[in-house]
């Protein structure tokens, strides 16, 4: 019961995100990975003006993963350990499978093939609709209702392209410190992200935000 924020809060309270002091130098030691769509603002800020065709939120808890320290250039292989089951070797099996996958894959230094895809799409807002919103924002700023506003729009396109190749092309053209590629299978959703901003990071009771607007 409850919404996705309630679910994540319960799972984190159960110790999913509990960190082992011996692993403090590793960037990610387990937990949930996913996204909250813009529509999730309705959970705390009132109803939305429009709805998305995509899920409002999707999260997963990986059983095994690679944590790469870009500062030290160290890669760490990790897996969940079922300590409640004596003799369980699932974590070791997951690590072996992960290591075998790395051996089979080409090196990360290999230059990916150029990605050229003819793309046609459309904006959600018309030119006139966008201009009307700009005018409304200017009036709000003049009245003193806000000192800053971020007007965004959605561009939609349909094309046949592999999401992982698209993400790698995005990172080449727009390298940024906060990038992500997520792939979900049910329903099929892929997220490619490359941003210079850190929205929010909370660790040990300290919250950090690194916006660039303003």
Model-identified regions with their sequence ranges:
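Extended alpha-helical targeting/anchoring segments
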Residues: 1-214
């Amino acid at each position: 019961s409850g919404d996705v924020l309630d679910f994540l809060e319960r799972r984190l309270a159960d110790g999913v995100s509990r960190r082992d002091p011996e692993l403090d130098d590793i960037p990610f030691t387990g937990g949930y990975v996913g996204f909250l769509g813009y529509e999730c603002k309705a959970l705390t800020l009132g109803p939305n003006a429009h709805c998305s065709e995509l899920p409002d939120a999707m999260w997963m808890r990986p059983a095994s993963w690679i944590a790469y320290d870009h500062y030290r250039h160290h890669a760490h292989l990790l897996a969940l350990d079922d300590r409640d089951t004596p003799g369980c070797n699932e974590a070791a099996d997951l690590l072996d499978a992960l290591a075998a996958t790395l051996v089979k894959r080409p090196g990360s230094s290999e230059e990916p093939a150029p990605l050229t895809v003819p793309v046609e799409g459309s904006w959600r807002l018309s030119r006139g609709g966008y201009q009307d919103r700009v005018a409304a924002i200017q009036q709000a700023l003049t009245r003193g209702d806000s000192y800053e506003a971020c007007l965004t729009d959605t561009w939609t396109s349909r094309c046949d392209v592999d999401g992982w190749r698209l993400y790698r092309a995005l990172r080449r053209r727009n390298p940024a410190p906060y990038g992500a590629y997520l792939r979900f299978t049910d329903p099929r959703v892929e997220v490619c992200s490359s941003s210079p901003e850190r929205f929010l990071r909370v660790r040990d009771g300290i919250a950090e935000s690194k916006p660039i607007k303003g």
